[in-house]
């Protein structure tokens, strides 16, 4: 039995979001639909989820005392991390004091950087991964590149969405990869992971939801990235039954080890029927935005249901679907969007604008979504819809 109170009253059921970007915004909307009181926290004002929350707080979530002060004042029923850059050691303490962290404080800690989750997957669970080394200094990094071999992928251990990520194709380009990882990662300079190249046919995100009734899987999501950042995704991605079964077993193993309830974005490489673990996020995944149109329960609805202990009897796929990012480039503190009617002229299309208040450089500002008779048609419709939305600075 789940009991939900009334927002802004003494009986309110409260979710506190740590991170208030576009993914957090959709979580907030789903929570609001169930009468949950939402508090949004982020490091900058007017973040997307703040625009649909009951209250907001602007603070560095790496500032442990400030984070604790907000949580003790708000007394949320659930603390829901939506990004990696959080004072996770403080979350572990708060969880021990009785504040539920989604899915668990340990999961947030292990996945806040690539080292924790890679060591769990490869060294504790014995999952197949790419070869890897960690490095703290330029000298250790160059030695790691030699050990793993060229070409190799270089990533800050604490970063996401491709920030600070590059490919070192030889010893000459390795120096530039080190410098880029030190300056472009979300958490500044620090430790990096050097990964050997994986020979794969394709990569997928397998959305895996742990809920009161067990573990469920969404249809596999294919995606394309540029410079490590998501640009388009589609669902379902075709794969053999053997590969799908192995992917689900691997996703089930790693999410069980992390524990708790909620949705996990498990990233996997597929080569024939072989499956190789890449990463996992204990929260909604950016490539999963396609589920806003592809499924009866989006990844955000699944996350909120799981958090609240509500049933998830089935996850129904409406049909082949795709998403295409709407990008802004330049500098603005009040971007606008010119939407040509052609953007939504086709049936089974939609656009979502995130409401991000500022643009500096290249930033994801929205997404176009489409259903089709097959994935290729859905992708073409999503691409066309996105092309008819122009960002004005």
UniProtKB/Swiss-Prot annotation:
Residues 119-308 form the ATP-grasp domain. ATP binds at residues 114, 155, 160-165, 195-198, 203. GO terms for biological process: 'de novo' IMP biosynthetic process. The keyword Metal-binding applies. One of its GO terms (molecular function) is ATP binding. Mg(2+) binds at residues 267, 279. One of its GO terms (cellular component) is cytosol. It is an enzyme of class 6 (ligase). The keyword ATP-binding applies. It catalyses: N(1)-(5-phospho-beta-D-ribosyl)glycinamide + formate + ATP = N(2)-formyl-N(1)-(5-phospho-beta-D-ribosyl)glycinamide + ADP + phosphate + H(+). Its EC number is 6.3.1.21. N(1)-(5-phospho-beta-D-ribosyl)glycinamide binds at residues 22-23, 82, 286, 356, 363-364. Keywords: ATP-binding, Ligase, Magnesium, Metal-binding, Nucleotide-binding, Purine biosynthesis. Pathway: Purine metabolism; IMP biosynthesis via de novo pathway; N(2)-formyl-N(1)-(5-phospho-D-ribosyl)glycinamide from N(1)-(5-phospho-D-ribosyl)glycinamide (formate route): step 1/1. Involved in the de novo purine biosynthesis. Catalyzes the transfer of formate to 5-phospho-ribosyl-glycinamide (GAR), producing 5-phospho-ribosyl-N-formylglycinamide (FGAR). Formate is provided by PurU via hydrolysis of 10-formyl-tetrahydrofolate. Belongs to the PurK/PurT family. Homodimer. This is Formate-dependent phosphoribosylglycinamide formyltransferase. The lineage of its organism: Bacteria, Pseudomonadati, Thermodesulfobacteriota, Desulfovibrionia, Desulfovibrionales.
